[in-house]
Amino acid sequence: MNLNDIALTGLIVLMLAFAVYDEFVVNFLKGKTHLQIKLKRKHKIDALIFIILILIVVYNNITVYGSRLTTYLLLFTILVTIYIAYIRSPKLFFKNNGFFYANTFISYSRIKTMNLSEDGILVIGLENKKLYISVSQIDDLERIYKFLIENR
C-alpha cells in the first residue's frame, strides 16, 4: 500500500463518516427533532467535474498498469461521491433551541431577520451573516414559518 492508497483510504473514510453523521447522527443531536425539511441539492456540477477527474485518473492508472487497489479505491470514491451529491438530500432539522443547517447548529436567539425572496428562498439573517435556505417543496416554507412562529 503506497501513499496514494493511504490518502484515498483516508478520503473514503472521511466521506463515509460525513455521510453517516449527516444521515443518522445529526437527527439525534440537541434534543428531539420537531420538524425535518428536505432542501434542494447544490453543487451537482462540481460533483460531476470531480467524478470526471477521478475517471481520468482511473483511466491513467489502468493504462500504466497501476495498482488494482488504487483503481478500486478510486472507483469506490466515485460511488461515495455519487451518494453524497446525487442520492442523499440535504436536510434542515428544527430542534427545541435551534436548527441544524449544513451540519451547523444555529440557535434561534441568533436570528435577527427573516425574509422570503421572490423565487422561494428563505433568507435568515444572523448577527453577521445570511443563510439562504432553498427548500425542495415550496409548501415547506409555510411549515417552517408556522414552526418558527409557534416555537420561537
UniProtKB/Swiss-Prot annotation:
The keyword rRNA-binding does not apply. Coiled coil: none annotated. GO terms for cellular component: plasma membrane. Signal peptide: none annotated. It comes from the Bacteria. It is a multi-pass membrane protein. The keyword Glycosyltransferase does not apply. Belongs to the UPF0266 family. This is UPF0266 membrane protein plu2700. It comes from Photorhabdus laumondii subsp. laumondii (strain DSM 15139 / CIP 105565 / TT01) (Photorhabdus luminescens subsp. laumondii).
